[in-house]
């Protein structure tokens, strides 16, 4: 897909389809007035006949318009102007693309400046329009045969954003560049998450990391920590998770050098990369077990983010860690009742081998102390309890630092990539007490998302840390299962905000 800024919407090469927003006050923007006048009041007659109401969720596609026979016009209802918001704006692009995909349209033009949102500028509108369009054009057909692949082709090739103000052209072009880089990185993350576990294991993650460094040799260095190295480091909790699998655990460290100043501290992004989670000895039921390939979504998100960061050449120093492992059942698997000594020296009693993500993360959280980080954010499909508490719309946020938490909440509000902060009250820590070790790896049956984060917080006391539990938001379940790429939009905005502080 190619994206462009246009200041003239009547050029023949992109006159296949025009897309307008219309509010319920039915006031026509200047561009629609030109169409209305040129078609002898055709649009006005449709409004008079109640064919166009401007109500939210309403859409009307016009063909064979008088004096514009080859032109299609799509009107998208925006509802009340004072209630129009980011959420509704993003949904309109999903609606429009779902309609356009069914048409023989090679080029279309969006009149984004007519979508009025309070305190939102043209740059934001275009950047998020590109991102929403690319999201809704996404499909994962890598393992379909060539005959089947052809069924999913669409005719659309070029999308234009009309700007009447020439002073906004540079901003519009920047928005396209940024939006496309973000959506490209999101696609990379979704593709990686959607890969089958017989192909995507820890070695595959490491190979992808190495390819990224080859693509951006001046910006990225990669170090792969294998199981022998981890054993020397004392990362016994991490290693225990992969003991039952023939696929060895590997930790891929992607170092992005966006600025040469040594005083610029590192931002650390850690992604849980369990490429398949059987639950281990505490084995899961067979229902939806195929979806446990998505337990590496955190690592995929971090990988996608490192691609975005490199494309945008952000002047930041960022380290992304893909914590790869596979939790399988065998005679070599770790067991309930085992006591593990973590890299930090703290001991953990294993009560449930299906609470494996925190065992990987606790050692990685200790490992990253060597980088003297400014902030550390881990992204993990950690607990089913998060899904129970927040469902599939909202990512769980837990943090030991109010400033970091507020920065993430701000980015969430800017992108509407939803998160909700949960508490780390002292009372919850008691649930992790063990009579034979420093702590247990699970608490009681209640507040599972919180106690899991309490566990992690014991290993992240030397820096500002946030945990994003994406168990409910990283993928969609069921027949149409697939990765969502969340929370890439949020984390990209968080990093961009760092530049403007």
From Swiss-Prot:
Q: Name one GO biological process term.
A: proteolysis
Entry annotation: catalytic residues: 284, 358
The enzyme's first-digit EC class, named in words, is: hydrolase
In the record, what terms sit under GO molecular function? Answer: manganese ion binding; metalloaminopeptidase activity
- Reaction(s) catalysed by this chain's protein: Release of an N-terminal amino acid, Xaa-|-Yaa-, in which Xaa is preferably Leu, but may be other amino acids including Pro although not Arg or Lys, and Yaa may be Pro. Amino acid amides and methyl esters are also readily hydrolyzed, but rates on arylamides are exceedingly low; Release of an N-terminal amino acid, preferentially leucine, but not glutamic or aspartic acids
Could you tell me which Gene3D superfamilies the record lists for this protein?
Answer: Leucine Aminopeptidase, subunit E, domain 1 (3.40.220.10), Zn peptidases (3.40.630.10)
> What cofactor(s) does the depicted protein rely on?
Mn(2+)
Q: Where does Mn(2+) 1 bind?
A: 277, 354, 356
Q: How are cofactors bound according to the entry's free-text note? A: Binds 2 manganese ions per subunit.
Respond yes or no to whether keyword Metal-binding is given for this record.
yes
| Binding-site list for Mn(2+) 2 | 272, 277, 295, 356
Intracellular or extracellular location(s): Cytoplasm
User: Which family is this protein grouped under?
Assistant: Belongs to the peptidase M17 family.
Superkingdom assignment? Bacteria
Q: What is this protein called?
A: Probable cytosol aminopeptidase
What is the role of the protein in this entry? Presumably involved in the processing and regular turnover of intracellular proteins. Catalyzes the removal of unsubstituted N-terminal amino acids from various peptides.
Q: Tell me the keywords, alphabetical order.
A: Aminopeptidase, Cytoplasm, Hydrolase, Manganese, Metal-binding, Protease
Q: What are the EC numbers?
A: 3.4.11.1, 3.4.11.10
Which gene is the coding source of this polypeptide chain? pepA
CC per GO annotation: cytoplasm
Which PANTHER family has this protein been placed in? CYTOSOL AMINOPEPTIDASE (PTHR11963:SF23), LEUCINE AMINOPEPTIDASE-RELATED (PTHR11963)
């Amino acid at each position: 897909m190619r994206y462009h800024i246009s200041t003239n919407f009547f050029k023949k090469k992109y006159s296949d389809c025009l897309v307008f927003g219309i509010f319920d006050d039915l006031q026509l923007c200047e561009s629609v007035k030109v169409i209305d006048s040129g078609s002898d009041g055709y649009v006005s007659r449709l409004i008079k006949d109640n064919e166009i109401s401007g109500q939210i969720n309403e859409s009307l596609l016009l063909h064979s318009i008088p004096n514009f026979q080859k032109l299609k016009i799509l009107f998208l209802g925006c509802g009340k102007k004072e209630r129009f918001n980011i959420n509704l704006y993003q949904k309109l692009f999903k609606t429009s693309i779902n309609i356009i995909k069914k048409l023989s349209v090679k080029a279309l033009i969006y009149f984004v400046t007519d979508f009025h949102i309070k305190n939102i500028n043209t740059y934001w509108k275009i950047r998020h329009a590109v991102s929403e369009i690319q999201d809704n054009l996404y499909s994962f057909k890598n393992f379909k045969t060539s005959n089947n692949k052809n069924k999913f082709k669409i005719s659309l090739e070029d999308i234009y954003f009309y700007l009447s103000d020439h002073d906004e052209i540079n901003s519009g072009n920047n928005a396209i560049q940024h939006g496309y880089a973000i959506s490209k990185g999101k696609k990379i993350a979704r593709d990686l998450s959607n890969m089958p576990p017989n192909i995507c294991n820890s070695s595959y993650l490491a190979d992808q990391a190495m390819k990224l460094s080859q693509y951006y040799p001046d910006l990225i260095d990669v170090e792969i920590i294998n199981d022998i190295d981890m054993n020397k480091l004392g990362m016994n909790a991490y290693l225990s998770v992969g003991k039952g699998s023939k696929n060895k655990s590997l930790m891929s460290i992607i170092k992005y050098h966006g600025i040469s100043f040594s005083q610029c501290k590192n931002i650390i992004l850690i992604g849980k990369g369990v490429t398949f989670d059987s639950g281990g000895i505490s084995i899961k039921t067979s229902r939806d077990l195929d979806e446990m390939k998505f337990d590496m979504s955190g690592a995929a998100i971090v990988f996608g983010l490192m691609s975005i960061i490199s494309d945008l050449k952000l002047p930041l120093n960022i380290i992304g860690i893909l914590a790869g492992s596979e939790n399988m059942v065998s005679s070599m698997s770790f067991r309930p009742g085992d006591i593990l000594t973590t890299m930090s020296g703290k001991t953990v009693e294993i009560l449930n081998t299906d609470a494996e993500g925190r065992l990987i993360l606790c050692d990685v959280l200790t490992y990253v102390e060597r980088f003297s980080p400014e902030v550390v954010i881990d992204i993990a499909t950690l607990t089913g309890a998060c899904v129970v508490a927040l469902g599939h719309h909202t990512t769980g946020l837990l943090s030991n630092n109010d400033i970091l938490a507020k920065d993430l909440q701000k980015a969430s509000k800017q992108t509407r990539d939803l998160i909700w902060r949960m508490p780390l009250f002292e009372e919850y820590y008691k649930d992790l007490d063990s009579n034979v070790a420093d702590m247990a790896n699970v608490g009681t049956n209640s507040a599972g998302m919180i106690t899991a984060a309490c566990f992690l917080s014991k290993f992240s006391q030397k820096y500002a840390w946030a945990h994003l539990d994406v168990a409910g938001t990283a993928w969609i379940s069921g027949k149409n299962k697939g990765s969502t790429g969340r929370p890439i939009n949020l984390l990209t905005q968080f990093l961009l905000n760092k530049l403007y502080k």
